[in-house]
Amino acid sequence: MEVKAGGIATLLTKFRKTLGRLIDGLFVLLAVPIVCILRLLFPIAPVRFGFFFADRIGHFAFDVEYFLASLECDRKSDKYTNLFFLVGKVANQYLLDLAKRELYIHRLVRYLYLADKFVPFGAKALIPARHLTGSRDRRGLYYSTNVHLNFTSEEERRGQKILADIGIESHEKVVCLIVRDSAYLNAE
């Protein structure tokens, strides 16, 4: 019925989605043996898979920093190799670049994560703070840890130059307000 109403455009969209699901399924099947090998190696080289929502800059920034802060507080987390993928369209590429300095993030990890759910006795997947805490620092980690997403010296210098270009010197205090219209969520 939808194809009749939408014509060839609807048919092509449905075909593309179906093909995408088939390709995803194939990649998940190919990832199952890798996950099985990682399970065997888990006692000596534990690996966990997780994800971050990247479609909202605030949630993305918080979740990455919160995860890094929790690693700093929980020393037994050091034994894990953590691999991540992103969910949603990346809201801010620069923030992603900062996150990639600290974490391994790659789209193919999604298939390992999905395959891990199919293999019995799975390792505990990493769940983003957005699900666990509503992207709130309920444990006070921000106040008890160092900042993890840092600018390089060159980035700091460029930022100081941009501020100087608009009349703000490095010694001056600045107040930033984060305000957005709800229309932002509907904008592309």
Mark where each language-model region is.
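N-terminal targeting/anchoring "stem" of glycan-biosynthesis enzymes
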Residues: 1-188
